[in-house]
Amino acid sequence: DIHALIESLSVPICVASNGSRDEITLRLKLAHLTQRFGSAIFSGVEVPHPKPAPDVFLAAAKAFNISPARCIVIEDSSLGVTAAVRAGMKVYGHAAVTSSAALREAGAIPFANMLELKSLLHNPL
């Protein structure tokens, strides 16, 4: 369950998406995650260049004052994986819509479900 996984993390987290702030907020609301992320939302619309450029991920790292090399990105698209790799971040790719092979080729470590992701986050490769 994504809610339990998020709550188990003791690190800063955010959402960094190519969507508008309104779209991101709506999706968080529908997933009952608004309270967990609060204002930690970064939109590709609000940076000079959207994904596959690294701008939205770099803006998030800067806002948290964290080196990109210390960030972990969870992505579900090759475009997003490319952006995170370009930002110098480690990427785990959720193979729900995009294939594991495509995510791996873009530079992600693919995972199929939240149990696998939990293992990756708590025991990084």
What do these predicted ranges mean?
Residues 14:
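Thiol/selenol-based redox catalytic cores and closely related redox-interacting motifs
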